Amino acid sequence: MAKRDYYEVLGVAKNASDDEIKKAYRKLAMKYHPDRNPDSKDAEEHFKEAKEAYEMLSDGQKRAAYDQYGHAGVDPNVGAAGAQGFGGFADAFGDIFGDIFGQAAGGGRARGGPQVYRGADLRYSMEITLEQAAHGYDTQIRVPSWAACGVCHGSGAKPGTKPETCPTCHGQGTVRMSQGFFSIQQTCPKCHGTGTYIPEPCAHCHGSGKVKETKTLEVKIPAGIDDGMRIRSAGNGEPGINGGPSGDLYVEIHIKPHAVFERDGDDLHCQMPIPFTTAALGGEIEVPTLAGRASFTVPEGTQSGKTFRLRGKGIKGLHSSIAGDLYVHVQVETPVKLTDQQRDLLKQFEKSLAEGGPRHSPQSKSWFDRVKSFFE
Protein backbone atom coordinates (compact mmCIF):
# COMPACT_ATOMS: atom_id res chain seq x y z
CA MET A 1 0.00 0.00 0.00
CA ALA A 2 1.32 3.43 -0.94
CA LYS A 3 2.53 5.60 1.92
CA ARG A 4 0.46 8.62 2.89
CA ASP A 5 1.90 12.09 2.62
CA TYR A 6 3.80 12.88 5.84
CA TYR A 7 2.14 16.29 6.19
CA GLU A 8 -1.26 14.64 5.78
CA VAL A 9 -0.38 12.07 8.45
CA LEU A 10 0.38 14.81 10.99
CA GLY A 11 -2.45 17.04 9.79
CA VAL A 12 -0.25 20.08 9.16
CA ALA A 13 0.39 22.35 6.19
CA LYS A 14 3.51 21.96 4.05
CA ASN A 15 4.82 25.27 5.38
CA ALA A 16 4.21 24.28 9.00
CA SER A 17 6.81 25.42 11.52
CA ASP A 18 8.92 23.00 13.55
CA ASP A 19 6.81 23.79 16.63
CA GLU A 20 3.56 23.07 14.76
CA ILE A 21 4.95 19.74 13.54
CA LYS A 22 6.10 18.83 17.04
CA LYS A 23 2.75 19.72 18.63
CA ALA A 24 0.83 17.75 16.00
CA TYR A 25 3.03 14.70 16.57
CA ARG A 26 2.72 14.89 20.36
CA LYS A 27 -1.07 15.07 20.06
CA LEU A 28 -1.19 11.98 17.83
CA ALA A 29 1.38 10.13 19.95
CA MET A 30 -0.71 10.72 23.07
CA LYS A 31 -3.86 9.55 21.27
CA TYR A 32 -2.49 6.40 19.63
CA HIS A 33 0.34 5.35 21.98
CA PRO A 34 0.31 1.54 22.53
CA ASP A 35 0.31 2.04 26.31
CA ARG A 36 -3.08 3.75 26.00
CA ASN A 37 -4.40 1.34 23.37
CA PRO A 38 -2.91 -2.03 24.35
CA ASP A 39 -5.26 -4.16 22.23
CA SER A 40 -5.65 -1.94 19.16
CA LYS A 41 -3.69 -2.84 16.03
CA ASP A 42 -5.19 0.16 14.29
CA ALA A 43 -3.87 2.53 16.97
CA GLU A 44 -0.45 0.88 16.76
CA GLU A 45 -0.31 1.47 12.99
CA HIS A 46 -1.40 5.10 13.41
CA PHE A 47 1.30 5.56 16.07
CA LYS A 48 4.02 4.10 13.85
CA GLU A 49 2.86 6.19 10.89
CA ALA A 50 2.90 9.40 12.94
CA LYS A 51 6.29 8.55 14.40
CA GLU A 52 7.81 7.97 10.95
CA ALA A 53 6.32 11.21 9.64
CA TYR A 54 7.70 13.16 12.59
CA GLU A 55 11.17 11.62 12.28
CA MET A 56 11.34 12.77 8.66
CA LEU A 57 9.80 16.23 9.00
CA SER A 58 11.62 17.14 12.23
CA ASP A 59 14.98 16.66 10.50
CA GLY A 60 15.69 19.72 8.35
CA GLN A 61 17.83 17.83 5.84
CA LYS A 62 15.35 14.99 5.41
CA ARG A 63 12.43 17.38 5.23
CA ALA A 64 14.09 19.32 2.41
CA ALA A 65 14.73 16.09 0.51
CA TYR A 66 11.14 14.95 1.07
CA ASP A 67 9.71 18.29 -0.04
CA GLN A 68 11.64 18.07 -3.30
CA TYR A 69 11.46 14.37 -4.12
CA GLY A 70 8.67 12.91 -1.99
CA HIS A 71 9.10 9.51 -0.34
CA ALA A 72 11.87 8.60 -2.79
CA GLY A 73 13.96 11.43 -1.37
CA VAL A 74 14.12 9.83 2.08
CA ASP A 75 14.05 6.18 1.07
CA PRO A 76 17.37 4.66 2.22
CA ASN A 77 17.27 2.22 -0.70
CA VAL A 78 17.33 4.99 -3.30
CA GLY A 79 20.80 5.78 -4.59
CA ALA A 80 22.40 3.04 -2.54
CA ALA A 81 24.49 1.73 -5.43
CA GLY A 82 26.87 4.67 -5.22
CA ALA A 83 30.08 4.28 -3.19
CA GLN A 84 29.61 0.53 -2.74
CA GLY A 85 26.34 0.92 -0.83
CA PHE A 86 27.45 3.77 1.46
CA GLY A 87 25.94 7.20 1.66
CA GLY A 88 22.63 6.48 -0.06
CA PHE A 89 20.65 9.48 -1.15
CA ALA A 90 23.26 12.04 -0.09
CA ASP A 91 25.82 10.49 -2.46
CA ALA A 92 23.62 11.18 -5.45
CA PHE A 93 24.03 14.88 -4.68
CA GLY A 94 27.70 14.31 -3.93
CA ASP A 95 28.31 13.02 -7.45
CA ILE A 96 26.64 16.06 -9.02
CA PHE A 97 28.09 18.83 -6.87
CA GLY A 98 31.43 17.12 -6.39
CA ASP A 99 32.02 17.21 -10.14
CA ILE A 100 31.33 20.93 -10.21
CA PHE A 101 33.07 22.09 -7.04
CA GLY A 102 35.77 19.46 -6.66
CA GLN A 103 34.32 17.67 -3.66
CA ALA A 104 31.29 15.55 -2.87
CA ALA A 105 28.50 16.42 -0.47
CA GLY A 106 29.31 13.30 1.52
CA GLY A 107 33.07 13.82 1.47
CA GLY A 108 35.82 15.00 -0.85
CA ARG A 109 38.86 13.95 -2.82
CA ALA A 110 42.24 15.37 -3.46
CA ARG A 111 42.76 15.72 -7.18
CA GLY A 112 43.95 12.43 -8.57
CA GLY A 113 43.12 10.62 -5.31
CA PRO A 114 40.27 8.30 -4.35
CA GLN A 115 36.93 9.65 -3.19
CA VAL A 116 36.70 10.10 0.58
CA TYR A 117 33.30 9.71 2.23
CA ARG A 118 32.14 10.61 5.71
CA GLY A 119 30.25 7.75 7.35
CA ALA A 120 26.47 7.93 7.50
CA ASP A 121 24.77 9.24 10.62
CA LEU A 122 22.68 6.76 12.59
CA ARG A 123 19.46 7.37 14.50
CA TYR A 124 18.29 5.54 17.59
CA SER A 125 14.79 6.08 18.98
CA MET A 126 14.51 5.78 22.75
CA GLU A 127 11.43 5.88 24.99
CA ILE A 128 11.77 7.15 28.56
CA THR A 129 9.35 7.95 31.37
CA LEU A 130 8.36 11.45 32.45
CA GLU A 131 10.21 10.91 35.73
CA GLN A 132 13.40 10.01 33.87
CA ALA A 133 13.02 13.08 31.66
CA ALA A 134 12.51 15.32 34.69
CA HIS A 135 15.39 14.03 36.80
CA GLY A 136 17.82 12.76 34.13
CA TYR A 137 19.74 9.51 34.35
CA ASP A 138 22.59 7.51 32.84
CA THR A 139 21.85 4.40 30.83
CA GLN A 140 23.27 2.04 28.24
CA ILE A 141 21.89 1.37 24.78
CA ARG A 142 22.70 -1.36 22.28
CA VAL A 143 22.86 0.04 18.77
CA PRO A 144 23.00 -2.04 15.56
CA SER A 145 25.80 -0.52 13.51
CA TRP A 146 28.64 -1.11 11.10
CA ALA A 147 32.33 -1.33 12.01
CA ALA A 148 35.51 -1.58 10.00
CA CYS A 149 36.21 -5.21 9.11
CA GLY A 150 38.79 -6.66 11.49
CA VAL A 151 40.19 -9.02 8.85
CA CYS A 152 41.00 -6.49 6.12
CA HIS A 153 41.07 -3.48 8.48
CA GLY A 154 38.45 -1.72 6.40
CA SER A 155 40.22 -1.93 3.04
CA GLY A 156 37.80 -4.50 1.61
CA ALA A 157 40.73 -6.41 0.10
CA LYS A 158 41.83 -9.96 0.88
CA PRO A 159 44.68 -9.99 3.45
CA GLY A 160 48.01 -9.84 1.61
CA THR A 161 46.48 -7.83 -1.25
CA LYS A 162 45.36 -4.26 -1.55
CA PRO A 163 42.95 -2.19 -3.61
CA GLU A 164 44.32 -1.18 -6.99
CA THR A 165 43.92 1.96 -9.03
CA CYS A 166 40.75 1.80 -11.08
CA PRO A 167 41.68 1.14 -14.73
CA THR A 168 38.54 2.89 -16.00
CA CYS A 169 39.04 6.31 -14.39
CA HIS A 170 42.76 5.93 -13.58
CA GLY A 171 42.15 6.75 -9.94
CA GLN A 172 40.20 9.95 -10.59
CA GLY A 173 36.85 8.56 -9.45
CA THR A 174 35.13 10.24 -12.40
CA VAL A 175 34.94 9.74 -16.14
CA ARG A 176 34.10 12.24 -18.87
CA MET A 177 31.45 11.39 -21.42
CA SER A 178 30.52 13.33 -24.54
CA GLN A 179 26.89 13.81 -25.51
CA GLY A 180 26.54 15.86 -28.67
CA PHE A 181 28.04 19.27 -28.04
CA PHE A 182 28.34 18.65 -24.30
CA SER A 183 31.03 16.95 -22.27
CA ILE A 184 29.75 15.59 -18.96
CA GLN A 185 31.82 14.45 -16.00
CA GLN A 186 30.20 11.72 -13.94
CA THR A 187 31.02 9.18 -11.28
CA CYS A 188 33.04 6.23 -12.52
CA PRO A 189 30.68 3.26 -13.00
CA LYS A 190 33.35 0.70 -12.09
CA CYS A 191 34.68 2.07 -8.80
CA HIS A 192 31.65 4.21 -7.88
CA GLY A 193 33.85 7.25 -7.33
CA THR A 194 36.40 5.69 -4.97
CA GLY A 195 39.24 5.72 -7.53
CA THR A 196 40.14 2.14 -6.67
CA TYR A 197 38.78 -1.33 -7.20
CA ILE A 198 39.31 -4.59 -5.35
CA PRO A 199 40.48 -7.50 -7.53
CA GLU A 200 40.44 -9.95 -4.58
CA PRO A 201 37.72 -9.02 -2.07
CA CYS A 202 37.99 -9.92 1.59
CA ALA A 203 35.99 -13.11 2.21
CA HIS A 204 34.85 -11.91 5.62
CA CYS A 205 33.20 -8.63 4.57
CA HIS A 206 32.76 -9.49 0.86
CA GLY A 207 34.77 -6.44 -0.17
CA SER A 208 32.66 -3.86 1.63
CA GLY A 209 35.29 -3.14 4.28
CA LYS A 210 32.66 -3.20 7.02
CA VAL A 211 30.79 -5.73 9.14
CA LYS A 212 27.64 -5.56 11.21
CA GLU A 213 28.02 -5.27 14.95
CA THR A 214 26.06 -4.18 17.99
CA LYS A 215 27.62 -1.38 20.00
CA THR A 216 26.95 -0.84 23.69
CA LEU A 217 27.10 2.88 24.40
CA GLU A 218 26.75 4.98 27.53
CA VAL A 219 24.10 7.68 27.18
CA LYS A 220 23.58 10.51 29.64
CA ILE A 221 19.98 11.74 29.61
CA PRO A 222 20.03 15.34 30.90
CA ALA A 223 17.39 16.50 33.38
CA GLY A 224 14.66 18.54 31.71
CA ILE A 225 14.92 16.95 28.27
CA ASP A 226 11.71 17.22 26.25
CA ASP A 227 9.95 14.94 23.80
CA GLY A 228 11.53 14.94 20.34
CA MET A 229 14.91 16.29 21.45
CA ARG A 230 18.04 14.55 20.19
CA ILE A 231 21.31 13.68 21.91
CA ARG A 232 24.37 13.59 19.64
CA SER A 233 27.07 10.99 20.15
CA ALA A 234 29.94 12.13 17.93
CA GLY A 235 31.77 9.49 15.89
CA ASN A 236 29.44 6.62 16.76
CA GLY A 237 27.76 6.46 13.37
CA GLU A 238 28.92 4.35 10.43
CA PRO A 239 32.63 4.32 9.58
CA GLY A 240 33.87 6.51 6.75
CA ILE A 241 35.21 5.27 3.41
CA ASN A 242 38.79 5.63 2.23
CA GLY A 243 39.82 7.25 5.49
CA GLY A 244 36.77 9.46 5.81
CA PRO A 245 35.51 10.35 9.30
CA SER A 246 32.82 8.33 11.00
CA GLY A 247 29.30 9.67 11.15
CA ASP A 248 27.45 10.54 14.34
CA LEU A 249 24.74 8.78 16.32
CA TYR A 250 21.61 10.74 17.19
CA VAL A 251 19.52 9.40 20.07
CA GLU A 252 15.99 10.74 19.68
CA ILE A 253 14.00 10.94 22.90
CA HIS A 254 10.30 10.08 23.11
CA ILE A 255 8.51 10.46 26.44
CA LYS A 256 5.82 7.93 27.31
CA PRO A 257 2.36 9.20 28.26
CA HIS A 258 2.03 9.54 32.04
CA ALA A 259 -0.86 8.14 34.07
CA VAL A 260 -1.26 11.35 36.11
CA PHE A 261 0.51 14.28 34.46
CA GLU A 262 0.52 15.95 31.09
CA ARG A 263 3.58 18.02 30.23
CA ASP A 264 3.53 21.43 28.57
CA GLY A 265 7.10 22.66 28.30
CA ASP A 266 8.35 22.93 31.88
CA ASP A 267 4.82 22.98 33.33
CA LEU A 268 2.74 19.99 34.40
CA HIS A 269 -1.04 19.60 34.43
CA CYS A 270 -3.14 17.08 36.36
CA GLN A 271 -6.84 16.43 36.93
CA MET A 272 -7.76 16.13 40.62
CA PRO A 273 -11.17 14.76 41.76
CA ILE A 274 -12.39 16.24 45.07
CA PRO A 275 -15.53 15.43 47.13
CA PHE A 276 -18.39 17.88 46.69
CA THR A 277 -18.32 18.49 50.45
CA THR A 278 -14.70 19.69 50.25
CA ALA A 279 -15.63 21.90 47.29
CA ALA A 280 -18.51 23.42 49.27
CA LEU A 281 -16.84 23.75 52.68
CA GLY A 282 -13.23 24.16 51.64
CA GLY A 283 -10.30 22.21 53.01
CA GLU A 284 -6.79 20.98 52.46
CA ILE A 285 -6.04 18.37 49.80
CA GLU A 286 -2.90 16.46 48.83
CA VAL A 287 -1.70 16.19 45.25
CA PRO A 288 1.12 14.12 43.75
CA THR A 289 4.17 15.83 42.25
CA LEU A 290 7.28 14.42 40.61
CA ALA A 291 9.16 15.20 43.84
CA GLY A 292 6.62 13.64 46.23
CA ARG A 293 3.39 14.95 47.73
CA ALA A 294 2.26 18.55 48.10
CA SER A 295 -0.80 20.05 49.76
CA PHE A 296 -2.82 23.19 49.21
CA THR A 297 -6.05 24.70 50.47
CA VAL A 298 -9.23 24.58 48.43
CA PRO A 299 -11.35 27.62 49.32
CA GLU A 300 -15.00 27.35 50.28
CA GLY A 301 -17.34 27.30 47.28
CA THR A 302 -14.83 25.93 44.76
CA GLN A 303 -16.47 25.08 41.43
CA SER A 304 -15.65 22.10 39.20
CA GLY A 305 -13.00 22.99 36.62
CA LYS A 306 -11.23 25.52 38.86
CA THR A 307 -7.47 25.55 38.28
CA PHE A 308 -4.91 25.97 41.06
CA ARG A 309 -1.29 26.85 40.36
CA LEU A 310 1.51 25.37 42.47
CA ARG A 311 4.63 27.37 41.68
CA GLY A 312 7.89 25.50 41.18
CA LYS A 313 6.27 22.05 41.24
CA GLY A 314 6.77 21.41 37.52
CA ILE A 315 9.95 20.37 35.73
CA LYS A 316 13.28 22.17 35.73
CA GLY A 317 14.13 23.26 32.20
CA LEU A 318 17.07 21.79 30.32
CA HIS A 319 20.29 23.23 31.82
CA SER A 320 18.19 25.44 34.10
CA SER A 321 17.73 25.67 37.87
CA ILE A 322 14.22 27.14 37.55
CA ALA A 323 11.29 24.74 37.62
CA GLY A 324 7.96 25.23 35.92
CA ASP A 325 4.61 25.09 37.70
CA LEU A 326 2.03 22.40 38.42
CA TYR A 327 -1.54 23.24 37.41
CA VAL A 328 -4.17 21.27 39.31
CA HIS A 329 -7.58 21.19 37.62
CA VAL A 330 -10.14 20.14 40.23
CA GLN A 331 -13.17 18.08 39.26
CA VAL A 332 -15.97 18.09 41.83
CA GLU A 333 -17.14 14.50 42.24
CA THR A 334 -20.84 13.73 42.57
CA PRO A 335 -21.52 10.87 45.03
CA VAL A 336 -23.16 7.70 43.71
CA LYS A 337 -24.88 4.66 45.25
CA LEU A 338 -26.38 6.65 48.12
CA THR A 339 -28.06 5.02 51.12
CA ASP A 340 -31.61 6.00 52.06
CA GLN A 341 -30.30 8.06 54.95
CA GLN A 342 -27.84 9.91 52.71
CA ARG A 343 -30.57 10.56 50.16
CA ASP A 344 -32.87 12.00 52.84
CA LEU A 345 -30.10 14.25 54.15
CA LEU A 346 -29.41 15.56 50.66
CA LYS A 347 -33.10 16.31 50.13
CA GLN A 348 -33.13 18.29 53.36
CA PHE A 349 -29.99 20.08 52.22
CA GLU A 350 -31.57 20.83 48.85
CA LYS A 351 -34.63 22.27 50.58
CA SER A 352 -32.48 24.51 52.74
CA LEU A 353 -30.68 25.81 49.64
CA ALA A 354 -33.98 26.69 47.99
CA GLU A 355 -35.05 28.62 51.08
CA GLY A 356 -31.82 30.59 50.98
CA GLY A 357 -32.41 31.93 47.49
CA PRO A 358 -29.97 32.22 44.57
CA ARG A 359 -27.03 33.35 46.68
CA HIS A 360 -26.04 29.70 47.16
CA SER A 361 -25.75 29.04 43.41
CA PRO A 362 -24.10 32.07 41.76
CA GLN A 363 -23.31 30.23 38.52
CA SER A 364 -26.89 28.98 38.10
CA LYS A 365 -28.27 32.48 38.73
CA SER A 366 -25.90 33.97 36.17
CA TRP A 367 -26.81 31.29 33.62
CA PHE A 368 -30.58 31.72 34.10
CA ASP A 369 -30.20 35.50 33.83
CA ARG A 370 -28.45 35.08 30.47
CA VAL A 371 -31.12 32.66 29.23
CA LYS A 372 -33.86 35.04 30.32
CA SER A 373 -32.30 37.96 28.45
CA PHE A 374 -31.83 35.72 25.39
CA PHE A 375 -35.58 35.05 25.11
CA GLU A 376 -36.65 38.63 25.86
Curated annotation (Swiss-Prot):
Cofactor descriptive note: Binds 2 Zn(2+) ions per monomer.
Repeat region (CXXCXGXG motif), residues: 149-156, 166-173, 188-195, 202-209
Protein localization: Cytoplasm
InterPro entries: DnaJ, DnaJ_C, DnaJ_domain, DnaJ_domain_CS, HSP40/DnaJ_pept-bd, HSP_DnaJ_Cys-rich_dom, HSP_DnaJ_Cys-rich_dom_sf, J_dom_sf
Domain J: 5-70
Chain residues that bind Zn(2+) 1: 149, 152, 202, 205
Zn finger region (CR-type): 136-214
CC cofactor: Zn(2+)
GO cellular component: cytoplasm
Stored Gene3D superfamilies: DnaJ domain (1.10.287.110), Heat shock protein DnaJ, cysteine-rich domain (2.10.230.10), Urease metallochaperone UreE, N-terminal domain (2.60.260.20)
Positions contributing to Zn(2+) 2 binding: 166, 169, 188, 191
Domain of life, source organism: Bacteria
Family per similarity comment: Belongs to the DnaJ family.
Free-text domain note: The J domain is necessary and sufficient to stimulate DnaK ATPase activity. Zinc center 1 plays an important role in the autonomous, DnaK-independent chaperone activity of DnaJ. Zinc center 2 is essential for interaction with DnaK and for DnaJ activity.
PANTHER family documented for this protein: CHAPERONE PROTEIN DNAJ, DNAJ HOMOLOG 1, MITOCHONDRIAL-RELATED
Function recorded in the entry: Participates actively in the response to hyperosmotic and heat shock by preventing the aggregation of stress-denatured proteins and by disaggregating proteins, also in an autonomous, DnaK-independent fashion. Unfolded proteins bind initially to DnaJ; upon interaction with the DnaJ-bound protein, DnaK hydrolyzes its bound ATP, resulting in the formation of a stable complex. GrpE releases ADP from DnaK; ATP binding to DnaK triggers the release of the substrate protein, thus completing the reaction cycle.
Subunit structure: Homodimer.
Protein name: Chaperone protein DnaJ
Organism: Burkholderia mallei (strain ATCC 23344)
Higher taxonomy: Bacteria, Pseudomonadati, Pseudomonadota, Betaproteobacteria, Burkholderiales
